[in-house]
């Protein structure tokens, strides 16, 4: 099988044997980073260090932040189901600032902001606003939970890898902890119980921290990866259907180019009418909006000759569309 370019970036091909060789880096999370690049300055978002020193988010901190004005405007907006005001405020605040607003709202009105979302708003819009109000790792933990428990997904292992594998090890650890706190269950045990498929073993290694955090690829690590692949994955990859193989190749792109991977994921989510595509679109836009969504937009336009804004506008509607467009940055 030869798919050629995936999203105009990583070139993959050469049949299933070549696929399994490329997969060697995925097995233990080896990251390929040019050795001649200077180290990136440390950037944190709750205690997470990111790989990309030139990452640019679309959502910036509001300065100054007028918390009292925000909660009063939100209170009136929820009473009248004014989605324009809700969107205008929450899409222009960082997650940390939204947490401050939510706490102040609770203290003043004795009501949780999530409860206020029960007003006459569309379902997708409510889900998106609720996601904005969540702690970032609880938000992703809920998407992990939905993937695990979904009866509509045919390849849960690949869908779950698409959420977890591109993240930093510290982020995965934070999601595992958030999952435990939110659902009182161990994510490793849940994967063992709920999952099947080609990549179940890789998922278990991922959530238990048994992945390399080294950025440079060396021969011993490569050989170790290949040995793990031969023993655990290669035979099952040979019998996997083309859809799984193609999605796996797209996933491999996150090893080389995380920005390109997310651009491809957004393109697939917008073009795909299958179950879960809308959630994928929402998850990526919200979770990357403060990190590198501006970079993803640039790559998207380069790869697909259209802006992400145009794609979102054409594929969504109403209050949900307006919120996503604000987050994407019109």
Language-model features: where?
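Structural signature for extended repeat/solenoid scaffolds and their inter-repeat hinge/linker regions
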Residues: 2-330
